[in-house]
Amino acid sequence: MPLLAVNVDHVATIRQARLAKSPDPVAAAALAELGGARAIIVHLREDRRHIGDRDVHVLRETIKTRLHLEMAATEEMLGIALKRKPDMVCLVPEKRQELTTEGGLGVAGREAELAAYVAKLAEAGIPTSLFIDPDPRQIEASKAVGAAYVELHTGAFADAATPAARQKELDRLLAAIPLAKSQGLGVNLGHGLDYDNIYAFKDTPGVSEYSIGHSIVARAVLTGMVEAVSTMCAIIDGFPD
């Protein structure tokens, strides 16, 4: 069955709203694991707007499952990844003005640059995932640069304004999953997934992991992190491998 990876960035967002010490994303990660999360995700942005270096360090020392580090493909972040040794790195595009990641990484056209970057991580035993749109060109380029996984960007599906638009985006995703698998890539899905729209994938094989953050943290504010995570786990547990 596919696994649930919980992103705790938005716990840090609440903390940073008051420049306080709580709520602590490290504590939230521990509770997410108690609820059944099989991995914890944090995005260490260049501007450190939510997750900070301390969070990555303490999470690496304390979580019992797996740590996935989302980051831009910069030299600074490469140094941090090589030092902290996350279980996976997911390379994402990054703009300082954006509220959240707005689209997939443009891998096509940057193959040589990204291949060298991915190789440095691989030499340290760190597999790389690339956060991409469900586009055949990006999938083929991801394979070419040596990525182990792709995370298909589900944001356009989640944000679609009409049923027809949502179906169009879902069809793109459903076509991209087997294409990526045929290239030997592992497939994760993430961005904008919640307790309702996740059911669109209930009969979809080939997904290794669902990456979910905001909807779980939003529910956790009202019901607690353990309940919020366990409810999502119960949904995903019924999905095919």
Curated annotation (Swiss-Prot):
Entry's Gene Ontology cellular component terms: cytosol
The enzyme's E.C. designation: 2.6.99.2
Keyword Transferase applies: yes
Principal location class: cytoplasm
Substrates-to-products reaction catalysed: 3-amino-2-oxopropyl phosphate + 1-deoxy-D-xylulose 5-phosphate = pyridoxine 5'-phosphate + phosphate + 2 H2O + H(+)
Listed InterPro entries: Aldolase_TIM, PyrdxlP_synth_PdxJ, Pyridoxine-5'_phos_synth
Root EC class: transferase
Residues that, per the record, bind 3-amino-2-oxopropyl phosphate: N7, R18, G192, G213, H214
Gene Ontology MF term list: pyridoxine 5'-phosphate synthase activity
Biological processes annotated in GO: pyridoxine biosynthetic process
Pathway: Cofactor biosynthesis; pyridoxine 5'-phosphate biosynthesis; pyridoxine 5'-phosphate from D-erythrose 4-phosphate: step 5/5
Keyword vocabulary terms for this entry: Cytoplasm, Pyridoxine biosynthesis, Transferase
Positions bearing the site annotation: Transition state stabilizer: E151
Protein localization: Cytoplasm
Entry annotation: catalytic residues: H43 (proton acceptor), E70 (proton acceptor), H191 (proton donor)
Binding site for 1-deoxy-D-xylulose 5-phosphate: D9, H10, R45, H50, T100
Quaternary structure note: Homooctamer; tetramer of dimers.
Entry-linked NCBIfam families: pdxJ, PRK05265.1-3, PRK05265.1-5
Function: Catalyzes the complicated ring closure reaction between the two acyclic compounds 1-deoxy-D-xylulose-5-phosphate (DXP) and 3-amino-2-oxopropyl phosphate (1-amino-acetone-3-phosphate or AAP) to form pyridoxine 5'-phosphate (PNP) and inorganic phosphate.
Family indicated by similarity: Belongs to the PNP synthase family.
Protein's recorded name: Pyridoxine 5'-phosphate synthase
Species: Solidesulfovibrio magneticus (strain ATCC 700980 / DSM 13731 / RS-1)
Lineage: Bacteria, Pseudomonadati, Thermodesulfobacteriota, Desulfovibrionia, Desulfovibrionales
